[in-house]
Amino acid sequence: MPKETKKIKSKLYKPKIENEKDFYNAINRALKTTDHRDALLSIIKEFEGYKKFMSENLIASSVPSDKILMFRFIYQLKEKVWKDIEIYGDQSLERLAEYIIDEMGWDNDHLHAFFFPEKRNGGIWEWYTSYEIGSAGVDNDQFPILHTDEVLVLSIDYSKHPRLGFVFDFGDDHRFVMEYKGLRDADKNEKKDNFPKVVDQRGVAPEQYPDYVD
């Protein structure tokens, strides 16, 4: 009789903000020794808003996962440049970001971030919003945020947010819209080591550092 394959027990994972306790301890110490009480309370309010938003828009997901998601990354600074990418649900946003950067032919030598759209001035703003998930090193200088190595691809509720903004290199400002295209079960012959992968694409990526004319 063939030996049975041992199944890996799945568990639920939901991202949590690191250093939250240290943040509150630092704020409480500062409240006792400063006259800038209103400014500090405002920072706490902003953090509570960020934390509430993430709690409502990130979901618990099973790890490991056999779900494969597809996204279309549409480059915004040049027409008709996009890539459809498939990735396992239990791979991280950091892995997805690194992959699209590499597929564009760029060096991963700058920070990146994903942004949830936000209503501003009567319209929808998709980049540099109040609700970001950034690479390690990204901070808003006020309070701790989630980072892309802590958030799984399947952690985001795409029924609420089928489009996210993505930015690589906050100086040269390479902007993308990331569109959720769907989810499927992995085939038994597919290996996670082969993901992420491009399944369709159009256009030619621009140079990472274009030549500017003085």
Residue ranges and their predicted role:
Residues 1-214:
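Short linear regulatory motifs enriched in tryptophan with gly/pro/ser
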